[in-house]
Amino acid sequence: MVSLEMLKEHETVRTAPVSEAEALVDVRGLSLWYGKKQALYDISVRFPRNQVTAIIGPSGCGKSTLLRSLNRMNDLVPGVRVEGEVLYEGVNIYDPRVDPVAVRRHIGMVFQKPNPFPKTIFENVAFGLRLMGVKGSELEDRVVEALKRAALWEEVKDRFKKESGLRLSGGQQQRLCIARAIAVEPPLLLMDEPTSALDPIATQAIEDLILELKERYTVVIVTHNMQQAARVSDRTLFMHLGVLVEEGPTEVIFTKPKHPYTEAYITGRFG
């Protein structure tokens, strides 16, 4: 039986660690509490630019909590307390002088369940751009470009100005949410189990899209699906009980894990 005390006694196992120069995000000594319950324990990890990093681990291990710490979404939960730093392009986003709303403009997020606005497809994608003051032909050009990058344009080009985003299929709605997120050109895109509510065909479309997105963006994805992590990611983090147990290139984590707990999880002995 794996205990928290046993995990905390061991340092994170790191294979081919990411250098400071390679990192878009540098997490240093991050701990987080929901009220009196500690959810993350002294996590330090770097997320490299233009790569996909997957976060895996059993339910309740802190995957989504870590992900939401990267754009301060956890601030919205009453009673949250954070220690440590999250450096985004060298700036600690938890510095009291940093506006969390401004942070979220730079860091896009796609949730487990598609959440399109009750607006037209066009207005869904235009929403963030309008907040930035983009208007006229530039607005339309950027909406179309985002829909193309999200592999949705060909399916909606004849109706995107008049049809509600709520009328799209589940897979299309998720791609619409991705288009909305990338329209404002965020260097970092966070995805919290983006395909868990989708059928296999829609899942394949999103996975193909993730592989394309890393050419322009840095992507961090939380997934319960280990096969998905193996397919789409360059690096993988394995978490358990709020502790970062092991991190490294995805191929290493899945074929030659160094930590016995990682191996036990990968081979299905717990989880």
Swiss-Prot record:
Biological process according to GO: phosphate ion transmembrane transport
GO cellular component: plasma membrane
Location in or out of the cell: Cell inner membrane
Domain of life where this protein originates: Bacteria
Cell wall biogenesis/degradation found in the keyword field: no
PROSITE patterns given in the database record: ABC_TRANSPORTER_1, ABC_TRANSPORTER_2, PSTB
Major localization listed first in the record, in broad terms: membrane
Membrane topology type: Peripheral membrane protein
Chain positions recorded as ATP binding sites: G57, P58, S59, G60, C61, G62, K63, S64
A Pfam cross-reference name: ABC_tran
Key words of the record: ATP-binding, Cell inner membrane, Cell membrane, Membrane, Nucleotide-binding, Phosphate transport, Translocase, Transport
Catalytic activity: phosphate(out) + ATP + H2O = ADP + 2 phosphate(in) + H(+)
InterPro entries xref list: AAA+_ATPase, ABC_transporter-like_ATP-bd, ABC_transporter-like_CS, P-loop_NTPase, PstB-like
GO molecular-function terms, A-Z: ATP binding; ATP hydrolysis activity; ATPase-coupled phosphate ion transmembrane transporter activity
Residue span, ABC transporter domain: 13-266
Gene3D superfamilies for the chain: P-loop containing nucleotide triphosphate hydrolases
Cross-referenced CDD domains: ABC_PstB_phosphate_transporter
EC number: 7.3.2.1
NCBIfam families: 3a0107s01c2
Its biological purpose: Part of the ABC transporter complex PstSACB involved in phosphate import. Responsible for energy coupling to the transport system.
Family (UniProt): Belongs to the ABC transporter superfamily. Phosphate importer (TC 3.A.1.7) family.
Assembly: The complex is composed of two ATP-binding proteins (PstB), two transmembrane proteins (PstC and PstA) and a solute-binding protein (PstS).
Protein name per its UniProtKB record: Phosphate import ATP-binding protein PstB
Encoding gene (name): pstB
